[in-house]
Amino acid sequence: DTIENVKDDDSVNTILRSRKNSSIYKGLEYTKNNLDTGFVSAGNTAALMVLSRLHMGMISEIDRPAICSLIPNKKNYSLMLDLGANLTVNGNNLLQFAIMGYCYFSILNKKTKPKIGILNIGTENNKGLEFLQEGADLISKSFLNEYFTGFIEPNNVTSGECDIIISDGYTGNIMLKSAEGISNF
């Protein structure tokens, strides 16, 4: 039984100290102890990220969790991450998101050579913020190089040219909410 609710404006400290009897806290605790289960929540995103990390831990060499979703495209779907967990990132975080995306996409889809792109304002190698350039460089120097197509512009996210689209959480969340708004137009 749960007797507490995580509110949308609860701080991380409040969530950790005062919401131990909430459905998010209890559900993730249950999921940790029952590995054949999953957990879905429409609740407070910050609570979900913090409590997931607390209860589930992180994969070795991965610093931060990322929110991902399947985005429909002209061919099938693309996996996009991060969609809001990390407002600020560095190039190494983008590499880690690419690794997580590659692993997850490979489980969902038996495609052996998924195409990976970084969401950016242009496809040219010299465009975009420093962390995007750094992320592209790190991905190009990793085992993912053979799958990396470079940068993808927002207007091509639904084209199907990339199977995995990497972004910082701020930009990814704006992209997601813009698409949701347009689909309701």
Task: Report residues per predicted region.
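Short, active-site-adjacent cap segments at secondary-structure transitions
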Residues: 5-7, 46-49, 124-127, 156-159, ...
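Glycine-rich phosphate/nucleotide-binding loop
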Residues: 53-66, 73-78, 159-185
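Structural motif
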Residues: 22, 37-39, 46-47, 77-80, ...
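A structural-propensity feature for long, helix-poor, extended segments
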Residues: 72-92
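Short glycine/serine/threonine-rich phosphate/pyrophosphate-binding segments
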Residues: 21-28, 32, 38-52, 63-68, ...
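Phosphate/nucleotide-donor binding subsite
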Residues: 1-36
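Alpha-helical scaffold segments in soluble metabolic enzymes
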Residues: 26-30, 51, 93-107, 134, ...
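Glycine-rich phosphate/diphosphate-binding loop of Rossmann-like nucleotide-binding domains
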Residues: 87-154, 163, 168
